[in-house]
């Protein structure tokens, strides 16, 4: 069996990792052993934060909806309860968009929720 020299593949693998580590600070962008660890950790952070991003945006939407709802003398939880009772199927992203960019439409949605709450009581 003939001898296999691994220099080409090793260099390619190292180059790939060092390219992924471009822009990192100090040895993390220059030394293969450290860069490899940094790239792996960056991948773990990226994976985790793709999940966290969804939670963060949902909480941002809730904060925006709550702020806009309180301007109409109703709390966030009462608004959501009223919308559920009224059968309005707007998600929090859509409600937040209305609250920020279309205040008249949001006011109409709030009135619908208030009417549903008043009807039940």
Swiss-Prot record:
GO terms for biological process: ribosomal large subunit assembly; translation. Transmembrane segments: none annotated. CDD domains: Ribosomal_L20. Disulfide bonds: none annotated. The keyword Oxidoreductase does not apply. GO terms for molecular function: rRNA binding; structural constituent of ribosome. GO terms for cellular component: ribonucleoprotein complex; ribosome. Keywords: Ribonucleoprotein, Ribosomal protein, RNA-binding, rRNA-binding. It comes from the Bacteria. NCBIfam families: rplT_bact (TIGR01032). Binds directly to 23S ribosomal RNA and is necessary for the in vitro assembly process of the 50S ribosomal subunit. It is not involved in the protein synthesizing functions of that subunit. Belongs to the bacterial ribosomal protein bL20 family. This is Large ribosomal subunit protein bL20. It comes from Francisella tularensis subsp. mediasiatica (strain FSC147). The gene is rplT.
């Amino acid at each position: 069996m003939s001898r296999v020299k691994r220099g080409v593949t090793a260099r390619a693998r190292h180059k790939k990792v060092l390219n992924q580590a471009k822009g990192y600070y100090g040895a993390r962008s220059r030394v293969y052993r450290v860069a490899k660890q940094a790239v792996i950790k960056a991948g773990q952070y990226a994976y985790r934060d793709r999940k966290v991003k969804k939670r963060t945006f949902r909480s941002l939407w809730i904060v925006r909806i709550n702020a806009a709802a309180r301007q109409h003398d109703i709390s966030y939880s009462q608004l959501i309860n009223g919308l559920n009772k009224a059968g309005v199927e707007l998600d929090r992203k859509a409600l937040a968009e209305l609250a920020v960019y279309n205040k008249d439409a949001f006011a109409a949605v709030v009135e619908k929720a208030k009417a549903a709450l008043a009807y039940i009581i």
